[in-house]
Amino acid sequence: VGIDLSPTAVAAATEAAAERGLSNATFVCADITSFTGYDGRFGTIFDSTLFHSLPVEGREGYLRSIRRAAAPGARYYVLVFATGAFPPEAEAKPHEVSEQELRDAVAPYFTINDVRPAYIHANSPEGMPAPPDAPRDDQGRLLMPAFLLSAHAEN
């Protein structure tokens, strides 16, 4: 189940899944900080670059909602931009997260197994110059500093 606040994004994801023959993929329009109806349903929850996009004051509701949706023993993975991922002069950027900030936010809801350095492979955002020495993958995407947290829900 994919959850997004935007009906346009939900429609696009639904169409893309249908084009790929993914008949068991579903997408719903809901606020990720307060969704209900999935209590104990998911054995794996993966947050790929959402956490750092939320307003800091929305994190508690988000984590409470996904913890409620987690089955006993569920695995939870979070990929976030690390502090320093964007140039200091960048005007528009997501909230970069320190390892400790990530741990402090998640620990009341899940048992943290590991937080490790990672990269987010990204196209250079419009209007955001990439440092000339920035590492890139074989497709030319920027390798932006990140953290990957893995955790689990206690029974």
Task: Please provide the spans of the model-predicted regions.
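Class I (Rossmann-like) S-adenosyl-L-methionine-dependent methyltransferase catalytic domain
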Residues: 1-40, 54-155
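Conserved acidic residues
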Residues: 43
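A conserved beta-strand element that flanks and buttresses the S-adenosyl-L-methionine
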Residues: 46
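Short catalytic micro-motifs in class I SAM-dependent methyltransferases
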Residues: 49-53
